[in-house]
Amino acid sequence: MRVATYASHSALQILKGAKDEGFETVAFGPSRVKPLYTKYFPVADHFIEGAYPEEELLEFEAVVVPTGSFVAHLGVELVEKMKVPYYGNKAVLRWESDRSLERKWLEKAKLRLPRIYEDPDDIDGPVIVKPFGAGGGRGYFLASSPEDFWKKAERLGVRSKEDLSRVQIQEYVVGVPVYPHYFYSKLNGELELMSVDRRYESNADAIGRIPAREQIDLGISTDYTVVGNIPIVLRESLLMDVIEAGERVVKAAEELMGGLWGPFCLEGVFTPDMEFVVFEISARIVAGTNPFVHGSPYTWLRYDFPVSTGRRIAMELKQGLEEDRLGELLT
């Protein structure tokens, strides 16, 4: 068995973790990035050109570890039909990618969620508008009124209420962005808090360097495209809030779609009242785990060796092989 993943997003971490656990590794993707994984950071034993070289991956007896880039490039329907063994529950993809199903899931988990506006004409306070699909924050924008919404939505091709299926309009909750990363072991039945990050976004994290008057004169609009990730260590008194939220999400997934296992992330904010408000779930490894290739403060508290989320995936696959339970982890 070899561990394979698409050459983008968090592939360096996934492949490094797999090699640390003794697996042979395979990266696949565009030819331009081959040196990144074989020369500059030699974590891939094999590199295959192509978005999804199914026959070659089957010949390698590979298990694909999904990332956001892989799902975004192939699309949910193709991933659901792929023949190469897939680490995780494919049924989760529909629930993650459909914002109405995602909300049903998070509501069942009894998480505090922002209000959703079905009609832009009902906007009565600050909102954040998000196009559907994983795009790393690309296309997000803020609006404060129905008029402001329609003016800014045009750049996304949303010109009438018939186009609203392309976006979700969320209450903008003021607070500190926090992205806790979890790992649920299906073999051990345990949830682990792996790490926490916040996103470094363009131009949201740079716009504060421009005085307000110049922002208005220049007509600058805020954008939330992710360019990197910054590690966070939470106040210890907040950890149980985060962990309990993760436990409830796993329990709800068991009832709705047959389970969620492996890595996932709850994307949210802590308000000034220290309330954890969740606005999204990423049901796979997220790029926010990349600062922790050598482990995080939380994994060092649990393990006495460096464990990244990528390595934790490989540890689970290795345990599955050793216990003859690998089939329980794959779909």
Curated annotation (Swiss-Prot):
Pathway: Purine metabolism; IMP biosynthesis via de novo pathway; 5-formamido-1-(5-phospho-D-ribosyl)imidazole-4-carboxamide from 5-amino-1-(5-phospho-D-ribosyl)imidazole-4-carboxamide (formate route): step 1/1. Binds 1 Mg(2+) or Mn(2+) ion per subunit. Its EC number is 6.3.4.23. Its cofactor is Mg(2+); Mn(2+). It catalyses: 5-amino-1-(5-phospho-beta-D-ribosyl)imidazole-4-carboxamide + formate + ATP = 5-formamido-1-(5-phospho-D-ribosyl)imidazole-4-carboxamide + ADP + phosphate. ATP binds at residues 120-179, 201. GO terms for molecular function: ATP binding; ligase activity, forming carbon-nitrogen bonds; magnesium ion binding. Residues 76-322 form the ATP-grasp domain. InterPro entries: ATP-grasp, ATP_grasp_subdomain_1, IMP_biosynth_PurP, IMP_biosynth_PurP_C, IMP_biosynth_PurP_N, PreATP-grasp_dom_sf. It comes from the Archaea. Mg(2+) binds at E267, E280. Keywords: ATP-binding, Ligase, Magnesium, Manganese, Metal-binding, Nucleotide-binding, Purine biosynthesis. GO terms for biological process: 'de novo' IMP biosynthetic process. It holds the Pfam family DUF1297. 5-amino-1-(5-phospho-beta-D-ribosyl)imidazole-4-carboxamide binds at H9, S69, N229. Catalyzes the ATP- and formate-dependent formylation of 5-aminoimidazole-4-carboxamide-1-beta-d-ribofuranosyl 5'-monophosphate (AICAR) to 5-formaminoimidazole-4-carboxamide-1-beta-d-ribofuranosyl 5'-monophosphate (FAICAR) in the absence of folates. Belongs to the phosphohexose mutase family. NCBIfam families: PRK13278.1-3. This is 5-formaminoimidazole-4-carboxamide-1-(beta)-D-ribofuranosyl 5'-monophosphate synthetase. The gene is purP.
